[in-house]
From Swiss-Prot:
Keywords: Cytoplasm, Methyltransferase, Ribosome biogenesis, RNA-binding, rRNA processing, S-adenosyl-L-methionine, Transferase. This is Probable ribosomal RNA small subunit methyltransferase B. Its main location: cytoplasm. It comes from Synechocystis sp. (strain ATCC 27184 / PCC 6803 / Kazusa). GO terms for cellular component: cytoplasm. Pfam families: Methyltr_RsmB-F, NusB, RsmF-B_ferredox. S-adenosyl-L-methionine binds at residues 260-266, 284, 311, 330. Belongs to the class I-like SAM-binding methyltransferase superfamily. RsmB/NOP family. Specifically methylates the cytosine at position 967 (m5C967) of 16S rRNA. It is an enzyme of class 2 (transferase). The active site is at residue 383. It catalyses: cytidine(967) in 16S rRNA + S-adenosyl-L-methionine = 5-methylcytidine(967) in 16S rRNA + S-adenosyl-L-homocysteine + H(+). InterPro entries: MeTrfase_RsmB-F_NOP2_cat, MeTrfase_RsmB-F_NOP2_dom, NusB-like_sf, NusB_RsmB_TIM44, RCMT, rRNA_ssu_MeTfrase_B, RsmB-like_ferredoxin, RsmB-like_N.
Amino acid sequence: MISARQLAFLILRDINRRDSYTDVAIDRALQKHPLSPPDRRFCTELVYGVVRRQRTLDCLIEQLGDRPIGKQPPDLRRIVQLGLYQLRYLDQVPASAAVNTGVDLAKANGLKGLSKVVNGMLRRYQRAEEQGKNILDQEKISLGEQYSFPDWLMELFEQTWGKAETESLCAYFNQNPSLDLRINPLKTSRVEVAQSLAELNLTTTAMAGLPQGLRLGGKTGAITQLPGFAEGWWTVQDASAQWVAQILNPQPEETIFDVCAAPGGKTTHIAELMGDQGQIYAGDRHGWRLQKLAVTQQRLGLTSIKIWEGDLTQPGVKPPVELVDRALLDVPCSGLGTLHRNPDLRWRQTPATIATLLPLQQALLKAIAPLVKSGGTLVYSTCTLNPAENEAQIERFLQDHEDWRSEPFEWTSPQGQTNSVTSGMLTILPHHHHQDGFFIANLKKA
C-alpha cells in the first residue's frame, strides 16, 4: 500500500504540473489510492499544510540550500517542503522520521542522486532548531514571507485592518478550518444529531444565534459516512454561511429567487426555514453546478426548489419569475474570507482576477433589483474581506437606485451577544468570530 507521505508528494506534484485545485487533486488521489482513516488525515494535513505555508517553506529552502530555489528541480522542492513542514509545524512527527522519509521519497521518485541534498537541508534545519536558532530573521523577512501570503494581499489587509489585525487574521488563516453542520429540522433535531455523533466519540457544540447550527469536533473520517448524512438529517455549512438565509428571513408561501444558487447550501437553507412551503427559484449560469444542488435537494427531501439555468446579466435572458418577495444574491467573489478552507486561493487570486469580478457583481445587482416587489428584501453576500467587493458595491448600488435602502437587522456573535447592525451591512471576521470571513448586506425596496 502507498504511504501517506508518498501520496502527499504525488498530489503536490499533480497540483504543480496540472495546476489542479488542492481539494480536487486530493479527492482524485484518494479515490485511486484509498488510505486508512489516520493515513488519510495525515496525507490531507501534509498537502494542505504545504500549500498554505508554501512561501515560508520556500524562504527556508533559500536559506538552507546551496542553489537558488528557481534552479532546483520542482520535485526536489516538493520533497523538501514536505520535510520542512513536518519539522516546523507538526510536533507529533519525530524529527528523525521527517528527515528519513524525505530521503526515502527522493530515492523512490527518481531523485536518488539528490537524496543527500534533501538529507543535508533537513538536517541543517533540525540542528538549527535544536540550537534554538531561527533561520528566518524576523527583522529581514516580510510579513508575507512570515505568514505565507502574497505581498499584494498583505497590503490589502493592512490597508483595511491595520498591521496587528492583519497578523492575527493571517495566523488564523494558517489553521485548519472548523467543521459546521446545519441540521434539517424537517427530518430531525439538533439534539438527535448530537446524540448520534456522540456515539462515535465526536463532540458537538450548539452555535449561538443559529438554531440549526452544530460545530463538530474530533476525528470525523469521511463526512459522507457519518450517521444522518445519507438520510438528509444535516448538511455541511459554515456558521457564517448559515447567517445569510437567516438574515434574508424567508416566510412560508413566499416567492424567493436565489440568483447564484449552486451548489445549493443557502438555497436548501431557505427551503428549510420556509418549512418547504413556497416557491424558491434557484438560478445559476453553470448547469454542472446546479446538478450538485439537485443532488443535495433530493438528499434533504426538499420539494419547493425549482432549478433554473441562466445568466441574468446577459441581454435578452428571461428570468424564471416576474416578481419575488425576497432575493438572495450570493455573488461570485474572490473568496478571501475562506483562505483557511481554500489555501490555494491565496496563490490563485490577484488584483487582476478580482478586477474582473467587480463589474459582474455590479451587473447582477442591477439585474435583480427590478424583480423584487415593492417592500421586498434583497440580501447581498460574499465570502470575501475585500471592501471593493463588499461595502463599495452596496454604496454604489444605493447611489444608483433611490428606491432602495439599507435595512438594519440583528446578529448574534459566537460569544452569544446579540447586536443591532444599524448600517444593514455586516462583516464577519474569522479571527474574531472563529468562522469564515463573510460580508452580508440587507437591503429593502421602497
